[in-house]
């Protein structure tokens, strides 16, 4: 139920944006950070991210353009101020909805690419419910995308680790990621997507 888009006041009421996700022990960023630390000689720098969810939680799934402009503005300013970077990891959900922007995740990756430069490795981690198409993995967007395969998402830490591994290998010149997308004619309701039971379990096993 989405009675109206979440506005900036709705987001800021639940917490101020910051870079506190750096230092997480689990999840996409936790897995990414831990794996990067295992390589040694890597400096991780956090950029500003929204805090939590807006007032109303996930029921307010649409966001106003004002929200988009505010948070992407903070992120891009951080990248410009704290860079240059060798790689950037975007830990996203993947089903963001913004008034007036058809594919927000792809647009965010493009904005980051534009300020970071063509040689910076950009990896993205996504939820199982992400909406992914060719725009996100186009040359002007992300180099590699890692989506969780399980619901509940107990493999999100693993996806962060894989993103770190690929980023390091690309930077070392030992790996060149190639990405393709395919859209099968399948739509499943979210309350039947738990991969511990059928039909989602069978679908995911066949997809492997």
Regions from the PLM with identified roles:
Residues 43-46, 138-143, 176-182:
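Short, compositionally biased low-complexity segments
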Residues 1-77:
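N-terminal glycine-rich anion-binding loop in soluble enzyme alpha/beta folds
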Residues 2, 11, 59-68, 72, ...:
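Active-site histidine-anchored catalytic micro-motif
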């Amino acid at each position: 139920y989405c009675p109206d888009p979440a506005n900036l006041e709705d987001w800021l009421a639940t917490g101020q944006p910051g870079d506190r996700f750096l230092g997480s022990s689990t999840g996409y960023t936790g897995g990414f950070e831990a794996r990067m630390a295992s390589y040694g000689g890597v400096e991780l720098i956090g950029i500003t991210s929204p805090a939590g969810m807006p007032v109303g939680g996930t029921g307010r799934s649409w966001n106003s353009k004002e929200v988009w402009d505010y948070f992407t503005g903070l992120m891009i300013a951080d990248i410009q101020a704290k860079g240059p970077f060798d790689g950037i990891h975007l830990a996203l959900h993947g089903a963001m909805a913004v008034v007036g922007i058809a594919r927000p995740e792809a647009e965010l990756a493009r904005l980051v690419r534009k300020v970071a430069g063509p040689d910076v490795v950009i990896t993205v981690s996504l939820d199982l419910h992400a909406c992914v198409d060719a725009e996100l993995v186009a040359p002007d967007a992300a180099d590699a995308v890692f989506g969780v395969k399980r619901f509940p998402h107990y493999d999100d830490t693993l996806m962060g680790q894989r993103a770190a591994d690929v980023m390091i290998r690309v930077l070392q010149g030992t790996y060149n990621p190639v990405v393709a997308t395919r859209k099968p004619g399948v739509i499943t309701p979210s309350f039947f997507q738990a991969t511990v039971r059928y039909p989602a379990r069978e679908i995911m096993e066949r997809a492997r």
